[in-house]
Regions:
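Extended two-metal-dependent nuclease catalytic cores across DNA- and RNA-processing enzymes
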Residues: 1-124
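Low-complexity, acidic/Ser/Thr- and charged residue-rich accessory regions of DNA metabolism proteins
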Residues: 103, 113-165, 174-175
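Low-complexity, intrinsically disordered or signal/transmembrane-proximal segments
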Residues: 169-170
């Protein structure tokens, strides 16, 4: 995955990595499981969902639990493992924090759901839906010339003609 969005860290596995572009260009960071564990102080990447649910994320309109910021969320993940673990063990909290967490349990559950990237959406895939029609070469050529894309015009024509020959050959239609 190539994204600057920390939410996607929840999807990192042994076989799925996150390539996080650096701000203002200039390379990227590669996040595997160890990097996610270190950044969020979690045991498993899927705990990022709980972490974000606890502390909230204003850029994604996730409210989080009132009074819980990054440090407290890391502490709670370490101590309770999940939002559910936190909410079922509020007796271990003290003072105002206990009151806030108990009073906002539903908000915490909602925040966790808002932080979860849904993977069980129905997706149908038919490769034919992605086949491109042949472009109107003359129209494309005219647009490129109007925009003075000389090299792009030459490259387009060269690659288009090559790919058309290859496609015809693969289909056994040697015109």
């Amino acid at each position: 995955m190539v994204t600057p969005d920390k939410d996607f860290a929840q999807l990192v596995t042994d076989h799925i990595f996150m390539y996080k572009p650096n701000s203002f260009g200039g390379g990227y960071e590669t996040w595997g499981i160890p990097e996610v564990q270190k950044k969020f102080e979690v045991e498993r990447p899927e705990q990022v969902i709980d972490f974000l649910g606890m502390m909230g994320d204003s850029s994604d309109n996730i409210p989080g639990l009132p009074g819980v910021g990054e440090k407290t969320a890391k502490k709670f993940i370490n101590q309770f493992g999940s939002m559910e673990g936190l909410l079922s063990n509020t007796d271990q909290l003290k003072g105002k924090m206990k009151e806030k967490v108990e009073a906002n349990a539903e908000l915490g559950r909602l925040s966790k759901e808002l932080a979860r990237i849904m993977l069980d959406v129905p997706v149908t895939f038919d490769a034919k839906d992605f086949e491109l029609d042949h472009p109107d070469v003359e129209k494309v050529k005219q647009i490129f010339q109007d925009l003075e894309f000389r090299r792009l015009t030459d490259n387009f024509l060269k690659h288009f003609l090559e790919s058309r020959r290859t496609l015809r050959h693969q289909r056994g239609n040697k015109e």
